[in-house]
Curated annotation (Swiss-Prot):
Keywords: Cell projection, Cilium, Cytoplasm, Cytoskeleton, Phosphoprotein. Forms part of a complex involved in intraflagellar transport (IFT), the bi-directional movement of particles required for the assembly, maintenance and functioning of primary cilia. May play a role in chondrocyte maturation and skeletogenesis. PANTHER family: INTRAFLAGELLAR TRANSPORT PROTEIN 46 HOMOLOG (PTHR13376:SF0). Residues 283-301 have a biased composition (Polar residues). It is found in: Cytoplasm, Cytoskeleton, Cilium basal body; Cell projection, Cilium. Signal peptide: none annotated. Residues 1-13, 31-52 have a biased composition (Acidic residues). This is Intraflagellar transport protein 46 homolog. The lineage of its organism: Eukaryota, Metazoa, Chordata, Craniata, Vertebrata. Component of the IFT complex B, at least composed of IFT20, IFT22, IFT25, IFT27, IFT46, IFT52, TRAF3IP1/IFT54, IFT57, IFT74, IFT80, IFT81, and IFT88. Interacts with IFT57, IFT88 and DAW1. Interacts with ARL13B. Interacts with IFT56. Interacts with TTC25. Interacts with IFT70B.
Amino acid sequence: MADNSSDEYEDENNKEKKKTSQLTPQRGFSENDDDDDDDDSSETDSDDDDEEHGAPLEGAYDPADYEHLPVSAEVKELFQYISRYTPQLIDLDHKLKPFIPDFIPAVGDIDAFLKVPRPDGKPDNLGLLVLDEPSTKQSDPTVLSLWLTENSKQHNITQHMKVKSLEDAEKNPKAIDTWIESISELHRSKPPATVHYTRPMPDIDTLMQEWSPEFEELLGKVSLPTAEIDCSLAEYIDMICAILDIPVYKSRIQSLHLLFSLYSEFKNSQHFKALAEGKTAFTPPSNSNSQAGDAETLTFS
C-alpha cells in the first residue's frame, strides 16, 4: 500500500511540473505583447503630433518669412514671442433646452358687423358721416356733437342738435352721473380762452422772472401789504399791480385779468408746487426766530 501511494504522489508532481513548464513561455509572450502595444500607441501618438505640428495651417505665421527684415535686436526678440504663444482651447458647452412659452390669451375687440353692406346696395358712409364704434360702449350723440363743435371751434354755425331727455330721471341716477362726468371732462379739456389786450401788457413768462436780490432782501424785512391795509379797493389793486410790474390803465379790467392769469400760472406750476411743499415740510427754527427778531426790530423802530 505504501509503494502504490508513493507512485501516485510522484505522478501528480510530474504533471504539475509539466503544466508550469507550459505556462511560463505563454506569460513571457504576453508581456512582450504588452510592450509591443505600448510601442504602437506611442508611435501613433507621435505620428499624430507630427501631423499636427508638421503640417502648418494655410496663412499661419512662418518665422522664416521675417528673418531678412532690417530691424533691431529688440524687435527680433518681439517676433520670438509670436512662436512662443500657445492659444488656449476653450470648449464651450452649448445646451439646447426646449421650452414652452407662456400662454397669453388675446381677446380681440367685439365686432358688431356694422361693415356689412346694405341689401339695397346704397352706401351707409360708415366712418365718414356716422361714427364707427364697438357696440359695447357707444358714445352719447349730444356729447359727441359738443366735442366736435369744441374741437372745430365753429360755435356760430346754426345746426340741429339733439336734446337728450330722460324719462323717470329719479329712477336712473347712473345716467345723470354719466352726463355730468362727460360734461365735466369736456370743460376740463377746454383750452384757456385767448384774450387780446387793447393796451400793451407784459408777457406771463416775463412776469414770472425772479426779482432782483435787493428787492428780495427788502421783502425779507418788510412784508407785502395785506388786504387789511386802510385803503380803497382801487388803490389796493394799483399797489399790488405796481409790485408785480403790471401796468395799470384807466380801466383796471385788463390789469386784473393779467394778475389772475399770473396767479393761475404760479398755482399750476409743478416747480413752485415742489418749492412750496419743501418749505412747508422743512421749516428750521433758526429762520423763524431770526424773522421774528427782524419783525420785532422793525416794529419797535
